[in-house]
């Protein structure tokens, strides 16, 4: 009774000490503490298993300890599978703390393999996890057991580390490159080889225990040892394509194992993947740049061919792709540049998102013969050439039909309004004429760089009352062309002259009507482009 009083006083004193305010731990601290506890528990279980195995080996060497060895064999067999489950891959080791067992392998910013605890610590504090806590004892205890893991490591190194994997995002599961340590297909190969090595050791150790005279061990070892050996000796192969290398094994509707590629293909398309799509190299994504990637001999060739999507090669590859894309898109406008009369051979090389390179210096020069051309066939090709010039630079952006008026975007007033404001109405027109003054005049003989507006086209329909001769399909002629027919009325035969003038006038009106229809179609195309 008196002995229990101090314990009760200690229990009553606990709430008083807990009244002291404490800082609440953050989520990162809780995760790091949980990982530390799990890693410490895994280390203690590994040490306990190691001590049990050493004690069993020592007792098995003594002649008089057969009965005690057979009695303790069952607990060791029960605890060994748990230690095998803790060690996910025997070929890995944390580059920071050196541990070989972790629930999740991570990668450091340099590409090295680290355990889950070191990865969470680095993610939370941006500092490498300190390793001088209890590592001296664990390192001293972990040095004796490598006979079991050395065989597995040797088999994995012989089968995977000296492989022919090209690296750089293309993997064939054999290893041998710089970044193969974290490849899922390579990890699967290591896991299979490690399982086979462990099963072989367990079977040999089971046969060694079977020679003991204890009957209980002879009954247990034949039942437990051959099962993992049979399961590990059979490699898993895809039911569809037959491959044995894949980053993730899946199952079809019947439960057969299939590779990741066949499973995704069936999930997306609803049918099995054709066998001719099978490839010997697996292309995987590079989320983290592996260490010393630039020193890999295959990095340059793979990045130039486009098979690798590594982050360090992405800027050059993207720039090269943009250059090729622009070169392909600008192949058609290059022909138009060579066909331009005032264009030199060196066409401007602009960025793909820059304004279209257009030379406006030869635009007015090429459009001058429209008003002063001697014949009709000379004016039509010029008009078509100007229209082709208008929509040729824009064709690389997907616009195929653009009228010539889109070249001069600023448009505030029509040419007819500008002409009426600049010059008064000429006195040479007939009294009964209701038409507007001509667009071109002697003061401004050079025509503008674009066609007239819709209002000027519609107002030109009253041109029937003007007795003038015009043989080109360009704009209405200047004043000196309209003044030229003035000396013709005082002719000896006015009837024949009027008949000839009516025929010429009819032909001229038909040509002008066709010209106005063409201009109206151009305006309609321009309006259609503006509505888009």
Curated annotation (Swiss-Prot):
Keyword Iron found: no
InterPro entries reported for this sequence: Transcription_factor_GATA (IPR039355), Znf_GATA (IPR000679), Znf_NHR/GATA (IPR013088)
Xref: Pfam families: GATA
Gene3D superfamilies the record matches: Erythroid Transcription Factor GATA-1, subunit A
Biased composition regions of type Polar residues, renumbered to the chain: 59-87, 295-312, 430-444, 452-462
Location(s) in or outside the cell: Nucleus
First and last residues of each zinc finger (GATA-type): 94-118, 238-262
UniProt KW keywords: DNA-binding, Metal-binding, Nucleus, Repeat, Transcription, Transcription regulation, Zinc, Zinc-finger
GO cellular component annotations of the record: nucleus
Domain of life of the source: Eukaryota
Chain positions covered by the region annotation Disordered: 56-87, 131-153, 202-227, 291-318, 422-506
Coiled-coil zones: none
Protein's GO biological process: negative regulation of transcription by RNA polymerase II; positive regulation of transcription by RNA polymerase II
UniProt-listed SMART domains: ZnF_GATA
Single GO molecular function: DNA-binding transcription factor activity, RNA polymerase II-specific
This protein's name: GATA factor SREP
Source species: Penicillium chrysogenum (Penicillium notatum)
Gene: SREP
């Amino acid at each position: 009774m008196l002995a229990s009083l101090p314990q009760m006083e200690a229990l009553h004193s606990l709430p008083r000490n807990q009244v002291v305010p404490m800082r609440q731990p953050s989520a990162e601290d809780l995760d790091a503490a949980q990982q530390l506890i799990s890693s410490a528990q895994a280390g203690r279980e590994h040490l306990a298993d190691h001590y049990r195995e050493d004690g069993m080996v020592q007792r098995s060497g003594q002649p008089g300890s057969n009965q005690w060895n057979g009695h303790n064999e069952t607990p060791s067999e029960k605890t060994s599978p748990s230690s095998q489950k803790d060690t996910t891959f025997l070929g890995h080791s944390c580059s920071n703390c050196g541990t070989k067992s972790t629930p999740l392998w991570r990668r450091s910013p340099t590409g090295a393999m680290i355990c889950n605890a070191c990865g969470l610590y680095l993610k939370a504090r941006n500092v490498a996890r300190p390793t001088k806590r209890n590592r001296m004892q664990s390192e001293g205890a972990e040095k004796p057991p490598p006979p079991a893991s050395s065989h597995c490591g040797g088999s994995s190194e012989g089968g995977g580390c000296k492989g022919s994997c090209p690296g750089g995002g293309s993997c064939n599961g054999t290893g041998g490159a710089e970044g193969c340590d974290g490849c899922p297909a390579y990890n699967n190969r290591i896991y299979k080889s490690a399982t086979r090595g462990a099963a072989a050791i367990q079977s040999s150790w089971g046969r060694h225990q079977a020679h003991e005279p204890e009957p209980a061990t002879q009954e247990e070892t034949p039942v437990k040892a051959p099962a993992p050996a049979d399961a590990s000796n059979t490699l898993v192969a895809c039911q569809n394509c037959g491959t044995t290398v894949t980053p993730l094994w899946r199952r079809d509707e019947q439960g057969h194992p299939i590779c990741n590629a066949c499973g995704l293909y069936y999930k997306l398309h609803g049918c099995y993947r054709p066998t001719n799509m099978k490839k010997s190299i697996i292309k995987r994504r590079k989320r983290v740049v592996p260490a010393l990637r630039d020193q890999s001999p295959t990095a340059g060739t793979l990045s130039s061919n486009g098979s690798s999507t590594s982050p360090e090669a992405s800027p050059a590859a993207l720039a090269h792709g943009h250059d090729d894309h622009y070169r392909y898109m600008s192949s058609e406008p290059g022909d138009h540049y060579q066909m331009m009369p005032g264009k030199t051979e060196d066409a401007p090389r602009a960025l793909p998102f820059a304004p279209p390179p257009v030379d406006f210096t030869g635009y007015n020069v090429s459009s001058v013969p429209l008003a002063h051309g001697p014949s009709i066939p000379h004016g039509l090709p010029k008009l078509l050439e100007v229209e082709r010039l208008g929509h040729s630079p824009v064709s690389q952006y997907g616009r195929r039909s653009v009228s010539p008026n889109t070249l001069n975007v600023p448009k505030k007033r029509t040419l007819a309004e500008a002409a009426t404001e600049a010059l008064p109405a000429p006195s040479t027109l007939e009294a009964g004429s209701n038409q507007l003054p001509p667009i071109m005049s002697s003061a401004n003989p050079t025509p503008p760089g674009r066609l007239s507006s819709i209002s000027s086209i519609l107002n030109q329909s009253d041109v029937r009352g003007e007795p003038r001769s015009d043989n080109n399909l360009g704009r209405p002629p200047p004043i000196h062309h309209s003044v030229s027919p003035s000396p013709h009325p005082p002719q000896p035969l006015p009837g024949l002259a009027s008949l000839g003038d009516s025929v010429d006038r009819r032909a001229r009106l038909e040509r002008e009507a066709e010209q106005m229809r063409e201009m109206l179609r151009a305006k309609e195309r321009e309006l259609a482009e503006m509505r888009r």
